[in-house]
Amino acid sequence: MQLLTIGINHHTAPVALRERVAFPLEQIKPALSTFKSVFLGHPAPNAPEAAILSTCNRTELYCATNDRAARDAAIRWMSDYHRIPADELAPHVYALPQSEAVRHAFRVASGLDSMVLGETQILGQMKNAVRTASEAGSLGTYLNQLFQRTFAVAKEVRGTTEIGAQSVSMAAAAVRLAQRIFEQVAQQRVLFIGAGEMIELCATHFAAQGPRELVVANRTAERGAKLAERFGGRAMPLADLPARMHEFDIIVSCTASTLPIIGLGAVERAVKARRHRPIFMVDLAVPRDIEPEVGKLKDVFLYTVDDLGAIVREGNASRQAAVAQAEAIIETRVQNFMQWLDARSIVPVIRHMHTQADALRRAEVERARKMLARGDDPDAVLDALSQALTNKLIHGPTSALNRANGADRDSLIDLMRGFYQHAPRSSDTSDR
């Protein structure tokens, strides 16, 4: 079985492409079914295992399959599923086989591949991806083991290194950018659109600045109100956004919508109503919540998740010692996992050996029963049974020895000596 990871991330593709390749949560299970259908007709042991990880910064397909053409098939499937021309997608896609796939999974879960070095959110996202794949019935022995090892490695890295210390989060970066536009965030009205984990983090950082007003707009009114109350703010219906957008100086949006919820026309009207006072907007969603054309307006300062990444990277350089320590841990764990994977590769051989040996045993036992039934001497029958089993079980190894030549024969003799502990060493044999 071969492990393979296919994906794009913030290192290889801009947000404009990442949002087109993203999988909304409700689409992941159906997508896994369509991916497995690519391999329809394969016998059950060869059917692929698969899991999809889709976040703001990456979309990745983890799979385990015996299909030699899996790499090309997976890339073609991703291209077809999202209706993106293959020649447009391919330059941004990475395909990582075997140990590279294992190393990548370990690095991602440990926060080493994140835009925010050492961030913990990705670990929860990966666990959710595994849970979804499990519910979809697309996990098996290999990916289950990979992800269990992945979570253990992430725990070890975070527990024994300072990889997450003093990190500049996306939320903190948003506040820093806002302070470049508005000298005092405390004098501004702030609107958060959405009520998920990222918005909660942003609200925490902005609330610490003591803004003039903090408002949360969310599709689920109850959840929005609960978040607003936590930070001493208030909630408003998302449907009121077009009519009230002009009231806010800072707007931070991160929803799970598959289409933009803030269009160019609505922002143009808001700017006009504000008499061209600036609006600072942060779009942390992938796919984006705010139409990119909004960024061209004169009095609007629009930043995406990629723009915030530049600020985040400034804080990453100071933790290179922790990175080196984490990479060393990961490399050791990759080797351990590959040893397990190599050991798994001989399981079918061992199973076949047991099946063959058991078939021989059954045949000889049946023959012995017939001999006893016709009145043959029991001692003679037992002797014949043992002789027949011995001859048939060593027939394969002795035939291989007789066919081998030169160095191959010497290696095979040493190998057989390991099987049969009391065999003489090859150097002690006078006649080969």
UniProtKB/Swiss-Prot annotation:
InterPro entries: 4pyrrol_synth_GluRdtase, 4pyrrol_synth_GluRdtase_dimer, 4pyrrol_synth_GluRdtase_N, GluRdtase_CS, GluRdtase_dimer_dom_sf, GluRdtase_N_sf, NAD(P)-bd_dom_sf, Shikm_DH/Glu-tRNA_Rdtase. It comes from the Bacteria. Its EC number is 1.2.1.70. The keyword Chloroplast does not apply. Substrate binds at residues 55-58, 114, 119-121, 125. Homodimer. Catalyzes the NADPH-dependent reduction of glutamyl-tRNA(Glu) to glutamate 1-semialdehyde (GSA). Belongs to the glutamyl-tRNA reductase family. During catalysis, the active site Cys acts as a nucleophile attacking the alpha-carbonyl group of tRNA-bound glutamate with the formation of a thioester intermediate between enzyme and glutamate, and the concomitant release of tRNA(Glu). The thioester intermediate is finally reduced by direct hydride transfer from NADPH, to form the product GSA. This is Glutamyl-tRNA reductase. It comes from Burkholderia mallei (strain ATCC 23344).
